[in-house]
């Protein structure tokens, strides 16, 4: 093989390998953008960004954990956790697969069950691709150091009762006023 043919082959191989690398980067960017879109439409900000429930979301701590708790009768008070990749107060030690599993099953990597305000029942039918896209987006965020309070209450390991926020025997519907 002549030097010019060898140089041409080497140049072509470099171009092709760069293309593969760029293709992988583009696919990763698309996955992150898909995750950003899904996080937006399912309103993760509502429960996981400080100040949102007070009408002033603190975007400097975007998805860094809530400062407003949710009381679940009989179980206690729970706060939206820090979803950023901070290793001490967020999801920094979780893999994308572990995040996707938690979103769709309600189980954390250490076996705990996510707090009842987390709408796992709504997310259990997400495709694996969409759950991993959410995880990729969360891992792409800047880490926010924010340890949320709690949980507080009689138990830290909710049982199957978790989705019954108001027990059926305690719920009394209020009829509409006459004429409405």
Each model region followed by its residue ranges:
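Short, intrinsically disordered, charge-biased short linear motifs at domain edges
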Residues: 28-35
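Short, cysteine/histidine-rich loop/knuckle motifs that typically chelate Zn2+
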Residues: 46
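A structural feature that tracks compact, well-ordered secondary-structure segments
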Residues: 88-97, 101-107, 120-123, 135-137
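Sec/Tat signal peptide C-region and signal peptidase I cleavage site
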Residues: 21-27
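Local sequence-structure signature of Cys/Sec-based thiol-disulfide redox active-site neighborhoods
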Residues: 36-42
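Bacterial N-terminal signal peptides that target proteins for export
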Residues: 1-12
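Flexible coil segments in periplasmic/lumen-exposed cytochrome c-class electron-transfer proteins
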Residues: 30, 41, 49-78, 109-180
């Amino acid at each position: 093989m002549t030097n010019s043919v060898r140089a041409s082959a080497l140049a072509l191989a470099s171009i092709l390998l760069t293309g593969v690398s760029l293709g992988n980067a583009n696919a990763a960017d698309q996955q992150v953008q898909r995750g950003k879109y899904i996080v937006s439409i399912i309103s993760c900000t509502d429960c996981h960004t400080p100040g949102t429930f007070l009408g002033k979301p603190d975007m400097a701590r975007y998805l860094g954990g809530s400062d407003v708790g949710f009381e679940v009768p009989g179980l206690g008070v729970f706060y939206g956790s820090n979803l950023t990749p901070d290793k001490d107060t967020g999801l920094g030690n979780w893999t994308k697969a572990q995040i996707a599993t938690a979103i769709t099953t309600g189980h954390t990597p250490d076996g705990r069950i996510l707090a009842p305000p987390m709408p796992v029942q709504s997310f259990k039918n997400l495709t694996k691709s969409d759950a991993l896209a959410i995880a990729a987006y969360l891992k792409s965020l800047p880490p926010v150091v924010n340890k949320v309070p709690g949980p507080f209450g009689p138990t830290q390991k909710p049982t199957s009762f978790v989705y019954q926020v108001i027990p059926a025997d305690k719920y009394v519907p209020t009829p509409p006023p006459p004429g409405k």
